[in-house]
From Swiss-Prot:
Gene Ontology MF term list: double-stranded DNA binding
Function statement: A chromatin protein, binds double-stranded DNA without sequence specificity. Constrains negative DNA supercoils.
Post-translational note: Methylated at multiple sites, to varying extents.
Keyword set, alphabetical order: Chromosome, Cytoplasm, DNA-binding, Methylation
Pfam families, per the entry: Cren7
Record's GO cellular component terms: chromosome; cytoplasm
Entry protein name: Chromatin protein Cren7 2
Source organism phylogeny: Archaea, Thermoproteota, Thermoprotei, Desulfurococcales, Pyrodictiaceae
InterPro entries per UniProt: Cren7_sf, dsDNA-bd_Cren7
Subcellular location per the Swiss-Prot or TrEMBL entry: Chromosome; Cytoplasm
Subunit structure: Monomer.
Family: Belongs to the Cren7 family.
Length: 62
């Protein structure tokens, strides 16, 4: 299942706030505790990949 909903994140390479669709989203959690969802994004300006937190209601996709 592909990710389709754009998320507002801060691009660490440029420092700008951008709205991007994540390439992949996964759950990152310690054993037995509620974790966070992390998304993999590609910077539109530099082409570098970075990870950022996505909202908890965002579906896990690859």
């Amino acid at each position: 299942m592909a990710c389709e909903k754009p998320v507002k994140v801060r691009d660490p390479t440029t420092g700008k706030e951008v709205e991007l669709v994540p390439i992949k989203v996964w759950q990152l959690a310690p054993r037995g505790r509620k974790g966070v969802k992390i998304g993999l994004f590609k910077s539109p300006e530099t082409g570098k990949y970075f990870r950022a937190k996505v909202p908890d209601d965002y579906p896990i996709c690859s």
